[in-house]
């Protein structure tokens, strides 16, 4: 072993002086190499799964070289699904290692289509196969040479497609006496408070400022519906929910995360998480008036969740976001 190391050192030092061929260097193990480390889920959205591929390229030479291109085919059962290329012009330092990665996306529609012939499998066998082309023109005596470093890595793709929707938005009005008390406490006369409360309970249109200076709480209920169209075992975890008065609002009007603490996980193929938020008219009065009038900008409902696949070795609680405008016309108004 010691002799081989000495011989390598001698050959490297002698490159500028002796006519050594590329094959001679390779005979002594002096050739670039690629280490394709893993394929992992990078992110999820409602369209597909984005995978991340980590790899490194080792340079055994005392001069840097560049990567002409990393190209690969994504395969399903040895049939090409898609091709990709990356890293043209990336430099690898002398006697160094370059760590890098690239991503690709597999749509849920493709996964479910492939699964039709997979006899109910919970995951599908994919592979990524390709090579890295290395430009050796900066290495003495290798000016016209290119090294090709092949790689192949298998990975499992869960058979699933998440579906998230919101249903049954409803605002629950306080009783007549509670509203009258809130209005009078806010400065209205008893007669005016009675008229305002009766008008709201009867479903009449209200002015946008009817709740100004009025301290009153109203319950706002939603159903968050979650489903998995595939056969993979999964776990959906609700992390956070919020509602904004419009899509351009900078801050959440209501934080619903605390309202669902007792029921935030779904492990079956589908399920519903009931959510209840409290709207206080001191800071949400105009929004409540919009709901009652069914007129104005639609609020935006957002969900932050985590997904995991217990039967696969992917990271737990992969983040998945969902955002949807709620038409004001879809809100129901009910009484206590």
Residue ranges of model-derived segments:
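Bacterial N-terminal signal peptides that target proteins for export
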Residues: 2-11
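C-terminal motif of bacterial Sec signal peptides marking the signal peptidase cleavage site
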Residues: 19-21
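Intrinsically disordered, low-complexity Pro/Gly/Ser/Thr-rich segments with frequent PxxP/GP/PP motifs
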Residues: 79-113, 247-286
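Surface-exposed beta-loop interaction hotspot
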Residues: 141-201
């Amino acid at each position: 072993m010691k002799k081989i190391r000495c011989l390598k050192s001698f050959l490297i030092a002698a490159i500028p002086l002796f006519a050594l061929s590329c094959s001679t260097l390779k005979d002594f193990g002096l050739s670039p190499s690629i280490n394709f480390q893993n394929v992992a889920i990078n992110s999820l959205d409602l369209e597909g799964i984005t995978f991340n591929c980590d790899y490194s390229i080792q340079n055994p030479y005392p001069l840097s070289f560049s990567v002409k291109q990393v190209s690969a085919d994504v395969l399903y059962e040895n049939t090409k699904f898609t091709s990709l290329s990356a890293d043209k012009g990336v430099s690898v330092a002398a006697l160094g290692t370059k760590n890098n990665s690239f991503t690709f996306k597999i749509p849920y529609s493709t996964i479910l289509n492939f699964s039709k012939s997979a006899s109910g499998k919970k995951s599908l066998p994919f592979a990524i196969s390709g090579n890295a082309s290395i430009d050796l023109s900066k290495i003495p005596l290798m000016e016209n040479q290119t090294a090709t470093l092949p790689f192949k890595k298998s990975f499992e793709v869960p058979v699933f497609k998440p579906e998230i929707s919101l249903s049954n938005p409803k605002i629950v009005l306080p009783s007549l006496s509670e509203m009258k008390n809130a209005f009078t406490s806010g400065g209205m006369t008893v007669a005016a408070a009675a008229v305002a409360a009766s008008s709201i309970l009867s479903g009449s249109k209200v002015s946008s400022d009817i709740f100004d200076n009025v301290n009153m709480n109203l319950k706002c209920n939603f159903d968050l519906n979650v489903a998995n169209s595939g056969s993979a075992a999964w776990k959906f975890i609700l992390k956070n929910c919020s509602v904004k008065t419009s899509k351009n609002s900078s801050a959440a009007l209501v934080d619903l995360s605390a309202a669902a603490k007792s029921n935030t996980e779904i492990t079956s193929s589908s399920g519903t998480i009931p959510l209840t938020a409290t709207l206080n008219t001191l800071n949400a009065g105009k929004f409540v008036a919009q709901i009652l009038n069914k007129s104005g900008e639609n609020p935006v409902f957002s969900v932050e969740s985590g997904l995991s696949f217990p039967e696969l070795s992917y990271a737990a609680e992969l983040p998945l976001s969902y955002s949807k405008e709620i038409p004001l016309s879809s809100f129901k108004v009910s009484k206590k």
